Amino acid sequence: CGSGGVWHDWQAAMVSRDEGVPKFNKDLIKIFEYNDSDGLEQIFIENKDEIAAIILEPTIYEKPSSSFLQKVRTLADANNSLLIFDEIVTGFRFDLGGCQNLYNVKADMVCFGKGMGNGLPISAITGPNEFMKFFDSLWVSSTNNPEALSLAGTISVINEMKEKNTIQSCWRIGEKLFNGWNKIAKNYDLNINMIGYPIRMTIQCKDNNENDSMELEALVLQEMIKQGIFLAHGKSFLCYSHSEDDVVKTLNSFENTCKFINKIKPNQSYEHFLEGNMPKTIWSMAIPPTKKSFS
């Protein structure tokens, strides 16, 4: 499938819903755990001269250790492999220069999207000419290739970001939400914490045994929605239009939710208080079996 009978998607071979994806695609992908540079190095040892590129998001919610990204860069260079950053989410959100600039690690190629156009349909694959020139020998087509509105819009968006310091504003507002949320959770002795970054955070709910609790998360989201706060999948991405009043309203709603949850008796299940069906996991990324939760 795909134009001209050509189709390739490394990510489709990684997810749990992979019906129809040839097994050889999976065999071409080696997965390592984030922040495990030793594991990545072992992959290079076991697949000497066979690794074309390392592809990763420089960060999602787990923060990179002090030397992780630098070690990944070193391993790529030592093995003549490309380092490719997926900055579809982090680019133009964490920093105007993306995580490359934030963590001072230069990738060979970087993918951008979403934030650079403020909702307009645009994305970009970037890199130096020594790598980008190979696109001249490939047939790359896109429905929106001749569409110039998004290009003009993106230039305006980036100029606005520079002039109004929008990213710094989002970090500042995000810190108030992030810290305020976790303070409330601690005050009510509930393991309902925001993890990640003030600019990109998500709810992590755990039961008394420190296991992830989807039931508790579903209940939190339900009670927040009742008060006009919609946290899609428990995630929060701050944007420039969010105000301090929005943060105050969100935190007040969360405190009301905590009060409600604390009234639930120990022998009662969170699921009992759901007014709809329990959410179900539709798909998941393939990750190493030793993957641990983080905070």
Regions found by a protein language model. Name each.
Residues 41, 137-147:
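A short glycine-threonine-serine/GTX helix/turn-capping micro-motif
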Residues 78-80, 188, 227:
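Helix C-cap/helix->beta junction micro-motif
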Residues 174-178, 185-221, 272-291:
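Conserved PLP-binding catalytic core of the aspartate aminotransferase-like
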Residues 1-52, 175-178:
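PLP-dependent aspartate aminotransferase-fold enzymes
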Residues 39-43, 56-82:
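Active-site core of PLP-dependent enzymes with the aminotransferase class I/II
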Residues 162-164, 223-295:
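PLP-dependent enzyme catalytic core of the Aspartate aminotransferase-like
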Residues 149-168, 206-208, 241-245:
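Amphipathic alpha-helix from the class-I
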Residues 103-135, 146-153:
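Active-site PLP attachment segment
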